[in-house]
Regions:
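Short, well-ordered beta-strand elements
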Residues: 75-82
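Short, surface-exposed beta-strand-loop junctions and turns on beta-sheet-rich folds
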Residues: 35, 62-63, 83-85
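Hydrophobic ligand-binding cavity/cleft-lining segments
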Residues: 1-42
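Hydrophobic/aromatic beta-strand elements that line small-molecule binding cavities or substrate pockets
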Residues: 43-45, 62-70
């Protein structure tokens, strides 16, 4: 995150970038289907742009934003999970996202 001007200094964010060996539309269909998310998150889609961006709200008021871009060998998924309230929450979200992305990668690589 570039500049926290106007933000509470206690608010944290998490950034993760993952490459997938499939087209962006396939990853978009998985990320855009909240039924395929980890159950513990209880996501609600707030906004999306076809095959490129999804913004989600979670019950703790944190906000994951996924951006997809096409790469020569597939696509890149960038996650900016913003408005995280504590270092512990950020650690937990990092574990959740890394496990889910690993699961999605395994699924699309079959």
């Amino acid at each position: 995150m570039s500049d926290n001007r106007g933000r509470n200094a206690d608010i944290l964010s998490l950034e993760i970038v993952v490459e997938f060996p499939v087209e962006a539309s396939r990853i978009f269909s998985i990320v855009g289907d909240v039924a395929q998310w980890p159950e513990s998150l209880q996501p609600r889609i707030l906004k999306s742009a076809p095959h490129s961006k999804i913004i989600v709200g979670l019950p703790d008021f944190s906000r994951p934003e996924f951006t997809l871009s096409t790469k020569p060998q597939g696509c890149e998924l960038s996650l900016l999970h913003d408005l995280i309230k504590s270092t512990e929450d950020r650690k937990e979200y990092r574990k959740i996202w890394n496990a889910w992305f690993k699961s999605v990668l395994k699924r699309v690589s079959l």
